[in-house]
UniProtKB/Swiss-Prot annotation:
GO terms for cellular component: cytoplasm. It is an enzyme of class 2 (transferase). This is Thiamine-phosphate synthase. The gene is thiE. Keywords: Magnesium, Metal-binding, Thiamine biosynthesis, Transferase. Condenses 4-methyl-5-(beta-hydroxyethyl)thiazole monophosphate (THZ-P) and 2-methyl-4-amino-5-hydroxymethyl pyrimidine pyrophosphate (HMP-PP) to form thiamine monophosphate (TMP). SUPFAM superfamilies: Thiamin phosphate synthase. Binds 1 Mg(2+) ion per subunit.
Length: 215
């Protein structure tokens, strides 16, 4: 029997920041970001749930697409827009419960095999990475590069695609040239000397939003 697909999302998700705190969720929503992911690490359970509840409420207030990384039970419990899972989470997560709750599902992939596995689950979007070397998290795989990204995007026409991994503002035009529908960033915003300016530049490059006149 065919696996039922997860609810759809926009084909082009645009700028997709991945951040680790409620503070960043608040900042980026106020700055006009409409797709983002909360990836909390190393926090106690009570704090995690409190932050996820608050983030979901903020996402709804701004009518944004907020994905919760890893904590799928809390995402289901509190009615999140969506969940993002890594390959290592797919065997332990209750995918049927996520699907039945009406949540969107994004899946990380790091090579052709993982991409094929993701497609069998019919998720809402597929993340392709890591494209460039990254210091944000330890990666067991090597960077895929732009040629591999371009090939995978062309071979994944039925799903929204997200490029992730080591993507700086300077690299964004080259990433977009592959045809990928969304660009995920972490340090390009969170480690920027002026995060508001960096966010505005990324929204301009990826979504065509106008830059405010700089005086």
């Amino acid at each position: 029997m065919a696996t039922p697909g997860f609810p759809s999302t926009e084909q082009r998700l645009g700028l997709y920041p991945v951040v680790d705190s409620l503070l960043w969720i608040e900042r980026l929503l106020a700055a006009g970001v409409t797709t983002l992911q909360l990836r909390i690490k190393n926090a106690d359970d009570a704090q995690v749930e409190q932050d996820i509840v608050a983030a979901i409420e903020l996402g709804k207030r701004y009518q944004a697409r907020l994905f919760i990384n890893d904590y799928w039970q809390l995402a289901v419990k509190h009615g999140a827009y969506g969940v993002h899972l890594g390959q290592e989470d797919l065997e332990t997560a209750d995918l049927a419960a996520i699907q039945q709750a009406g949540l969107r599902l994004g899946i990380s992939t790091h090579d052709e095999h993982e991409l094929a596995v993701a497609k069998t689950l019919r998720p809402s979007y597929i993340a392709l990475g890591h494209i460039f070397p990254t210091q944000t998290k330890q990666m067991p795989s090597s960077p895929q590069g732009l040629a591999s990204l371009s090939r995978q995007v062309k071979n994944t026409p039925d799903y929204p695609t997200v490029a992730i991994g080591g993507i700086s503002i300077e690299r964004v035009p080259h990433v977009l040239a592959t045809g990928v529908g969304s660009v995920a960033v972490v340090s390009a915003i969170t480690l920027a000397s002026d995060w508001q300016r960096a966010t505005a530049q990324l929204l301009h490059l990826i979504e065509g939003k106008e830059l405010a006149d700089e005086k």
